[in-house]
Amino acid sequence: NILELLNIKWEYKGGKLSFKPDISDFSEFNNITINTMICPANESNVKGRAQSICIELVDNKGKSEKVEISKESNLINYPKGKLENLDFENGKEIKFWNQVTPISNIRIPMVLYNDIDLKNIKKCNIIFDRTNSGDLLFESIMVD
C-alpha cells in the first residue's frame, strides 16, 4: 500500500502553515491528533535530534493559543538508520533511508487550549519556531 503524505519543509525559524479546519466547533472533542514523522533523508533535520513544532488555534475573534509539541518529549523522533546510495550502471543514483521510519501518533489534549473559544475555531496554524530547519511528513491532523 502507498501512503499519501504531506511533506512540509522549512529553512528558517518562524515559518507557518495555516489552514481552515473542516469544522469550527472543537468543544466536543478531547484531542488534536497528529500523525507525522521526520523525513530522515533530508539534511535539514539534525541527525539524532527530535523535532519540535507548535499547533496554534485561532478563534473567530482572532484570539489565539499555541501548544508546543516538545522535542524533550521525543514525540517526533529522529529514526534509527542511515542514508544509503544505490548506484546504477547508467550513472543514476537513488538515496534512501535504510530502516523503516515509523509514524508518530501525537495527541494534544484540548484542555490545553483554555483561553480561546473552542466553539468557534476559524484557523489552525502549524508553527515552525523551535528549530532553524526541518522536514516532516504528515499523514493526518484531526480532532477526536
Predicted regions located by residue number:
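Beta-rich carbohydrate-recognition modules and glycan-binding surfaces
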Residues: N1-D144
